[in-house]
């Protein structure tokens, strides 16, 4: 899931803009260029760190990731030319990889010194335990809902499969940043056709979605359904072994809103079924759950920020309300550009204060 990372060592501080913040955490400036992340080599002492990322005219590098082995510890996506973003984490000693997007070279981050034990904070500990339970519950429900969906696909029952599709999607979209942290699992489960590189097989929910809504058939989909069950089972196994930091909850909430802006508002996510608002709501649900769990700690540190974020979540709920139809939503193709702009504005209004939560709690 999403997290953060580092600062430059003393020799690099000037060149990459690293500094201590007022609360003792570290900040490091990262530039996205067509040559990749700059600087490409970082060394930083262990402890709370915030990456501040700016796109310096690149159309290739539009994200920043910190990886440990095959796991993505932290990331910030969709940073196009002129935009910036940040994320935070309490880094432990070790060697990490940085990455700025397809076609760019990977960099190296070395975290030095002794492990920094987070200060005892019962509220943050409770938030992490609560989120762990939430993710586990969602992935169990995902497995069950996916199996019902894939059983209908294998049985050739197109209408039943269509009816069951949304229930599985909701469970996945609520915890998508967790799935994304496990390397290739998210592409296997959730890739859209334009995400698939030449020579790779397209698998997952959207491959079946296309067959159901554009062809009205499940012909050839049984192997795709089998693999989807397998990949969801693997996700459950990985979730059972996962652990989280408080900043990951906050960063994951921000990334869920990024998902809304990137693919739900545009109508790209569910381009065949037009169930984009179902996914939109699920992303917001997941983000809100993380915030609700973190709010007691945030109230102590910055109650004004906590109230602002809560109010902006209410604003998103109000923006979605006209499109609700019982437990579902209208076909997204019926939502006109002006209405989509209003939805986007509500999400953007929430995203800005929500992005401050991670940096606030990481120094708690």
Feature locations, PLM:
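Extracellular/periplasmic metallocenter environments
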Residues: 29, 79-120
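Beta-strand cores of secreted/periplasmic/IMS beta-sandwich domains, seen most often
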Residues: 40-59, 85-100, 226
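Mature extracytoplasmic or organellar-lumen-exposed domains after removal of signal/transit peptides
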Residues: 117-364
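N-terminal edge beta-strand
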Residues: 23-46, 144
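C-terminal motif of bacterial Sec signal peptides marking the signal peptidase cleavage site
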Residues: 12-15
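Beta-strand signatures of extracellular beta-sandwich domains
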Residues: 63-65
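Bacterial N-terminal signal peptides that target proteins for export
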Residues: 1-5
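Bacterial signal peptide processing site
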Residues: 17-20
């Amino acid at each position: 899931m999403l997290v953060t990372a580092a600062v430059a060592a003393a020799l690099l501080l000037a060149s990459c803009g690293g500094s201590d913040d007022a609360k003792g955490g570290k900040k490091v400036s990262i530039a996205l260029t067509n040559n990749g992340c700059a600087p490409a080599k970082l060394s930083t002492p262990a402890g709370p760190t915030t990456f501040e990322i700016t796109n310096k005219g690149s159309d290739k590098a539009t994200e920043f990731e910190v990886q440990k082995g095959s796991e993505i510890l932290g990331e910030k996506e969709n940073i196009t030319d002129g935009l910036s973003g940040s994320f935070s984490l309490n880094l432990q000693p070790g060697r990490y990889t940085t990455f700025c997007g397809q076609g760019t070279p990977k960099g190296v981050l070395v975290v030095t010194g002794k492990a920094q034990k987070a200060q005892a904070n019962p509220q943050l500990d409770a938030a992490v335990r609560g989120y762990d339970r939430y993710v586990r519950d969602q992935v169990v429900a995902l497995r069950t809902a996916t199996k019902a969906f894939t059983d209908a696909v294998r049985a050739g029952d197109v209408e039943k499969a269509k009816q069951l599709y949304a229930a599985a999607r909701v469970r996945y979209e609520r915890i998508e940043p967790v799935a994304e942290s496990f390397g290739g699992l998210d592409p296997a489960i959730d890739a859209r056709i334009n995400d698939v590189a030449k020579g790779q097989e397209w698998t997952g929910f959207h491959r079946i979605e296309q067959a159901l809504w554009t062809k009205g058939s499940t012909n050839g989909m049984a192997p795709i359904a089998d693999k989807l069950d397998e990949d969801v089972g693997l996700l459950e196994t990985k979730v059972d072994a996962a652990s989280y930091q408080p900043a990951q909850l906050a960063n994951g909430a921000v990334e869920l809103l990024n998902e809304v802006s990137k693919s739900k508002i545009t109508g790209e996510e569910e381009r065949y079924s037009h169930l984009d608002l179902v996914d939109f709501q699920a992303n917001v649900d997941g983000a809100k759950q993380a915030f609700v769990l973190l709010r007691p700690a945030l109230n102590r540190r910055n109650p004004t920020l906590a109230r602002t974020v809560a109010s902006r979540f209410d604003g998103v709920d109000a923006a979605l309300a006209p499109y609700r139809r019982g437990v579902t939503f209208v076909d997204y193709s019926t939502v006109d550009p002006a209405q989509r702009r209003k939805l986007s504005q509500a999400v953007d209004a929430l995203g800005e204060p929500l992005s401050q939560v991670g940096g606030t709690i990481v120094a708690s």
